[in-house]
Amino acid sequence: HAGAEMSSVGPIKRVTLWVRDADASLAIYRDVLGLEVLEDKRIAGPMIAQMVGLQDAKLRIVHLGPKGSTHGWIGLYELSEAKPAVATLATPPPDRPAYGQATIVLTTDRGSEILQGLRERGVRFMTTPREYTKEAASDVMPAGHYTEVIFFDPDNVPVSLIGFRAL
């Protein structure tokens, strides 16, 4: 609101996903969701590894976002030859969220097209598309018809797609 002090952080620069296979993740985030590859680079050695608590590693970094964006990126970070080995998280339940789990939420006006692409690639869904109506607008979200579907990416990260139609 007007006159409020500025936050000491933000906006979000990126969300980093530690992925097993950047190419498998690109097949979803780039090829189906349509995000642009803003940067794709490889770095290696103890200096970069120590930044993430390792002794040595190779790292592929792929930053994705809407074309020309400087914030709100998704970073796909693939570690290889890591010393010590990268830890593995337990697989979350297939039908509901788990405490400590994060969800990436994206808006789209291409919901049906994206849903078809996800199904063709055999992704696992937490929920099928659900529609709900928000009768009254709030300061941050308009009234309208919302559609939401949640699926899991190749590393079991939940991704929510939200569509919107005005009342």
Question: Where are these predicted regions, by residue range?
Answer:
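A cross-kingdom feature marking solvent-exposed beta-strand/loop segments within repeated
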Residues: 45-49, 84-91, 132-141, 145
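Vicinal oxygen chelate
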Residues: 3-7, 11-20, 60-81, 87-167
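Core segments of cupin and vicinal oxygen chelate
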Residues: 18-71, 120
